[in-house]
Amino acid sequence: QFAFYLGYGIMAIPAAIFIRIYSYKAGILLGLGLYAVGASLFIPASIYQEFYFFLGALCVLTCGLALLEVTANPYVLSMGHPDTATRRLNLAQAFNPMGSLTGMFIASSVILNKLQVEAFRNEERLAHPEYNDMLPSVVDGHLTQALSDFATNEPIAHQAMQAADLVTVRGPYVAIAIIASVLFFVYLFSKLPKTMSHDHPLTIGELKDTFGRLIRNQRYVEGVIAQAFYVGAQIMVWTFVIHYGMMAIGLTAAEAQGYNIIAMMIFLSSRFICTFLLGFFRPGQLLMLLAIGAIVLTLGAIFLQGFAGLYSLIGISACMSLMYPTIYGIALKDMGDD
């Protein structure tokens, strides 16, 4: 998780400077290039079975993702009338969860069911019926210890298991690298609308002036703070769905992933619903209402037990659907090239 989000942390500001100096198209091309390279690095990483190689590949991949997000979101805002910019970004962002859903479906139906380590854990459960009377978190500890003992006592068999699982995991990254490479050439030879007003490379002085204006813009600063809290909450909610299902209810990894897919489907459908509602509500009003709903559901996830708590946790996704693009749109309203 740290390596994944490190790419966003180290690339976001350089990406913004890059597209400010050059163009949105240049940002898209560089982002797709890094995305393809990062995904391709998973091939040698799986061959050499080096953990830090995987972390490096993941960081490069997310640097590409950061460039794509930093480029695409303000580009969408700039492509039309300012009054409908936030609604336009919500519509564009509604297609984002489709990729997440596809990835979750592949992980649940193709990857998890083929992983030998998951088969090992299931065999351990069957061999120890007493686990049925234990807390899921305790069972998970026993299964992790059993896997560690297996690695110690039968290192060759454990290494073969790892190698087989890495081949299974590698496939989707190869597909990502191919798709990103194809898109790179599609955008390379496409003519995109120009929305920036400057027609020359920006100087260091002009960039300093831009940062100065941003720091003095109260709405922008508050938007950055709000977005930081939102993204932190989103990561925690979506990461915790699987852990909650496995540790608090006792679901298998594949079953818990199924509930994660449900959360993403709710998130996806709510994005389209909220895009429609923005035709009748001001962005700030709708954002406030859904924030209140998210608070109520968060309290439910904290204090309710079993499936009621899980359903509350999943329901938060409906409220989160509006937040990222709407906070983004409100914070960047009337910003111009900045």
Language model features: what each stretch is:
Residues 67-81, 321-336:
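Intracellular juxtamembrane helix-capping segments at the cytosolic ends
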Residues 33-48, 292-306:
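C-terminal ends and interior cores of transmembrane alpha-helices
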Residues 193-223:
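Juxtamembrane intracellular "pre-TM" segments in multi-pass secondary transporters
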Residues 2-20, 261-274:
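Central cavity-lining transmembrane alpha-helices of secondary-active solute carriers
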Residues 108-116, 131-145, 149-158, 174-201:
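C-terminal membrane-cytosol helix-exit motif in multi-pass small-molecule transporters
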Residues 102-115, 213-261:
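Extracytoplasmic gate region of multi-pass secondary transporters
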